[in-house]
């Protein structure tokens, strides 16, 4: 949620952000107008309440016919107070509605444009030349079936399309990835968390998801709970309504199953486990002071790159364009791994700086210290998130490390988590 006071003081900054996102810049003016209407209606209500209190004293002192006349006026004034209170409430609600609809203010340097307007920041590693090696690469599903690692057919039988079983070395590989990521997180001061995967609507909305109109979210109607698409949601709600100490960043690593309906993905990635309804993910989540947010964002990206380096796959880092950031992010970097059979890069990780957007929605603050060290007021913290490992990484590992016979060489960094196994053999 945006800072309305800041928008009123610097409207052009918010107009520029909206334009970079390809969104309606006139929303800025509507917020300004709604805030003015709110202030005016509250002032009108408070003035009438003051008159009502003063009038009450006159009535108490009056007698006889004068008192009867004043009582009639009191009734009329009470009706006007009630009407003014209702108007003030409606004005507050209108401003809150606009405030919730307003995307986060992008940070300086974010490229303008939509999904295809990202900027490639770096490419690391060189894709293998399978033709020079003398064989045609198999895709991850064919490899997974040869290795007894992925079973889409039984996944569909049990649960429907876009579900799978990870079996044998497939299950072990995912667990190894998660443990490698968790060890990296522990090394860097993260607290491991296994969070709930069902959350209340206010928690989902607090992180920037629209529970009323987002077709990607699974809902349990009977209980009014939502299945999370990332542990970011539960971790963001962890400190909702609290005043935190973020003199040093507070870092959590959440390991959870995630669920996405993939409602807008008909016909896309129908083969294999690139786009599924259920997957596991290790997510980094950070609460930080506002001035530390950009540095923490850079660290999140660096940790993601360390993981990608550890699994030895070619990858690139892209700076996501403003129009593809989503509601909460002020800046987002994606790391995409090379997928040989598709001849392109596919997203494996994403890291977002949400500045104070989520904290404002969830009312998460820090205590401000004055120069002499005494307690001052409070202000919003910044929140950030980033992926350390997820089921989709299996795609990149299998395809990039395959051998001509269908076996797969295990990246050295994962071998300690697989009992020293150096190769996945055909079953």
Curated annotation (Swiss-Prot):
PROSITE patterns in alphabetical order: AA_TRNA_LIGASE_II (PS50862)
Catalytic activity, as annotated: tRNA(Ser) + L-serine + ATP = L-seryl-tRNA(Ser) + AMP + diphosphate + H(+); tRNA(Sec) + L-serine + ATP = L-seryl-tRNA(Sec) + AMP + diphosphate + H(+)
GO molecular function terms attached to this record: ATP binding; serine-tRNA ligase activity
Residues involved in ATP binding: 260-262, 276, 347-350
Enzyme class: ligase
Pfam families per UniProt: Seryl_tRNA_N, tRNA-synt_2b
GO cellular component: cytoplasm
Keyword Cytoplasm on entry: yes
Domain of life: Bacteria
Domain text: Consists of two distinct domains, a catalytic core and a N-terminal extension that is involved in tRNA binding.
Annotated function: Catalyzes the attachment of serine to tRNA(Ser). Is also able to aminoacylate tRNA(Sec) with serine, to form the misacylated tRNA L-seryl-tRNA(Sec), which will be further converted into selenocysteinyl-tRNA(Sec).
Name the record gives this protein: Serine--tRNA ligase
Taxonomic classification: Bacteria, Bacillati, Actinomycetota, Actinomycetes, Micrococcales
This protein's encoding gene: serS
